């Protein structure tokens, strides 16, 4: 489909053949391209700095208007400066925790600092740093950060806290350094709900990669667990797959991991885990999108409904080019409505067997009680 989502996504591929680069260059050089739609989509997908970095790597920036290229360069430079601050902060935090014998396992964006998943250090957009710690060290770690000027992040309050017995959280309340505007989340598990039960903290620690960051010892997820964590986090916690809101930044990281670690990632084991938990449709569609948009080489299982879900996810953004006609104008709305109906159609499963809550909250009486208390 000729949408802004698809065209931006194709630019985010970690590598391109000469033929693929030529095809993409021809599409970007079309005079009817709507650059405002592309920029808006890159921003929505949290992928603008990475978009600029990949365009530079692929030699495609020449096809952009000069003012847009200059604007993207400024955003990329600002994000690079922000990431340098985050790297400095991570080194400081690790030094403090190392001195107290507190082991740290880096998650998500923080892990990319350790292995330089993105050669361009300004490419990855980050809102915070996620650190997994053994549960017995959480309070000491929190106290140490508060001694360094961190406070409870007033913006990091979930509306689902009203649910009694909620197991929605995977970390203690976020800590923000008010002066440096940096937030650190101290995790005791990798994710809440079903993803956290699929990939446990114990499993993560048992196969973690050991290394150093600026002289400080640190761990991060093995490539197999990292890919699994990415796919689960991108599609499950906030019902992203059901709502049709899977972010290109997450798909791009999935593709980057597959490209960086082709020997360490075991597709057969990956899909065995996914099938065991009945997630082959959302995760299979997610991997299919990575393959179609970003040339990811991971094998995907044959899923009968994958093409339908692919269309639902890919076609809900505005057209990439200015086109007249009722169909072109209303196609994104049509697919957004389809995603909304699909999401609402799954509400009974979400309510009675909620992936966001613990196993003890899956019975009908318990769920009705929680709903009643929330309304009251």
Q: Where are the model-predicted features located?
A:
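Conserved NTP-donor binding/palm subdomain of two-metal-ion nucleotidyltransferases/polymerases, i.e.
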Residues: 1-127, 133-376
């Amino acid at each position: 489909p000729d949408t802004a989502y698809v065209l931006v996504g194709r630019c985010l591929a970690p590598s391109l053949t000469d033929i693929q680069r030529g095809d993409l260059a021809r599409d970007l050089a079309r005079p009817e391209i709507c650059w405002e739609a592309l920029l808006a989509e890159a921003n929505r997908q949290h992928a603008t700095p990475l978009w600029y970095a990949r365009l530079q790597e692929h030699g495609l920036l020449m096809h952009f208007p000069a003012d847009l290229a200059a604007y993207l360069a400024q955003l990329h430079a600002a994000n690079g400066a922000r990431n340098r601050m985050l790297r400095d902060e991570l080194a400081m935090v690790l030094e403090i925790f190392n001195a107290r014998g507190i082991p740290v396992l880096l998650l998500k964006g923080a892990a990319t600092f350790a292995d330089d998943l993105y050669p361009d250090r300004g490419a990855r957009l980050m809102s915070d740093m996620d650190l997994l710690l053994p549960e017995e060290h959480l309070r000491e770690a929190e106290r140490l950060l508060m001694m360094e000027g961190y406070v409870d992040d007033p913006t990091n309050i979930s509306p689902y806290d009203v649910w009694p017995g909620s197991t929605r959280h995977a970390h203690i309340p976020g800590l923000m350094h008010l002066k440096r505007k940096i937030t650190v989340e101290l995790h005791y598990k990798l994710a809440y709900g079903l993803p956290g039960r699929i990939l446990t903290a114990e499993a993560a620690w048992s196969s973690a990669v050991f290394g150093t960051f600026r002289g400080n010892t640190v761990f991060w997820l093995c490539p197999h667990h990292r890919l699994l964590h990415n796919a689960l986090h991108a599609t499950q916690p906030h019902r992203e797959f059901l709502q049709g809101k899977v972010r290109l930044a997450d798909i791009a990281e999935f593709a980057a991991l597959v490209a960086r670690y082709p020997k360490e990632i075991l597709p057969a084991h990956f899909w065995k885990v996914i099938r065991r938990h009945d997630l082959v449709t959302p995760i299979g569609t997610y991997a299919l999108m990575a393959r179609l948009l970003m040339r990811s080489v991971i094998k995907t299982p044959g899923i009968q409904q994958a093409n339908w879900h692919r269309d639902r996810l890919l076609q809900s953004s505005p057209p990439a080019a200015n086109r007249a006609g009722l169909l072109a104008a209303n196609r994104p709305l049509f697919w957004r409505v389809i995603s909304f109906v699909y999401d609402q159609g799954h509400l009974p499963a979400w309510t009675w067997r909620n992936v966001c809550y613990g196993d003890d909250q899956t019975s009908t009486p318990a769920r009705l009680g929680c709903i009643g208390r929330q309304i009251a």
